[in-house]
Amino acid sequence: MRARLAVAGVCALLLSGCSSDSSDDASADPSPAPSSTPPASSPAPDPEPTEPEPTESDAAAEPPARPVSVLGLDQQTHRGDRLRLGAVREDTADYTSYDVTFRSRSTSPAGQTESWTISGVLNVPKGRGPFPAVVLAHGFIDPAVYERGQGMTRERGYLASRGYIALHVDYRNHAESDDDPRYQLRMRLGYSADVINAVKALQASRDVPVADDRIALFGRSMGGGVILKALVAEPGLVRAAAPWASVSSLEGENYDRFQRTDPDDTSRPDDPGRVHGLPEDNPEFWLANSSRPHFDRITEPVLMVHGRVDDTCPPRWATATHRALVAAGVDSQLEWYDDAHAFGPAFDAAMDRTIRFFDQQLA
């Protein structure tokens, strides 16, 4: 991760959304399975030691962010590698599709490294290359029923048929990926880390003919929020990004719409509102896990695509996110289509617009 100027700490979660494939069984109101119980209360701390006088180097050091926050994600060092091609899923006149895995590693400022094997699907166009690439971040599908490559099958094929390598990231805890037992308590920030590391794994690969300086991100629903957090945490990583039918860029809104439950419901011990406090009780935490307060860190052009009759992620969310991006100085465009969340009749037109955007930005 490049050194970068410090900005006040925050970090992120995406708690909702669904997939684009009309055949995918995606819930618009996800209720994730419990993963772990909240930690027990810590013992009383020792008396605080006397602070030494700050030095000039101390003043220049980047201040620590909340560990569970978007800026906490930024302060980690991310390394993606070991992209391995597996079985051929599909072989068409335009592209070959493979099952793949890659390694997603993140190291904290304290030097603690976590490493996960992430599964996915890779479509590679026919020809010699090198080809531009798009990393795909899918929407919410219950990990208990999710299957490898599910959620953006149409988009993956469309991109590859137009000459783009398309890497669909399953995320940790999905399909053949390793399980992170704390992914819920960490507000699913690991999903954004996996997307960042997917880009780096493509760039490190000798087996995939990728133009490693011509890569973009493409996320649907929950995945739209995933890629916005990746842009905040790793400015300059890619050349462009396209959030489709995205969840809100304020995590409190996502929680209220998709995850808030009866206060007496104890069936989900990893409910973030129960563990970290509800948005109205701990607003600082929820802002720290939102991308919007840190849009001024984003350096890439953004194309937002949204349906006017989306009843899963309300159109007002897209309007608010776009306005906040523009106010922060981001080159953002918002395209509207007369369609719903999953994009049926307007899919081809929306994909053609998105590919024109990628063609312009990755040229």
Regions found by a protein language model. Give the residues of each.
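C-terminal motif of bacterial Sec signal peptides marking the signal peptidase cleavage site
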Residues: L15-G17
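N-terminal low-complexity, Pro/Thr-rich disordered segments
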Residues: S19-V68
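N-terminal cap/lid segment of alpha/beta-hydrolase-fold proteins
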Residues: Q75-R128
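Short substrate-entry loop that stabilizes the transition state in hydrolases
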Residues: R128-F131, L136-D178, L250-E251
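Alpha/beta-hydrolase active-site loop
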Residues: L185-R206
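Hydrolase active-site cap/lid region
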Residues: L228-P279
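Short beta-strand/loop motif that positions the catalytic acidic residue
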Residues: I298, M304-H306, D310
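C-terminal catalytic histidine-bearing segment of alpha/beta-hydrolase fold enzymes
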Residues: R316-A363
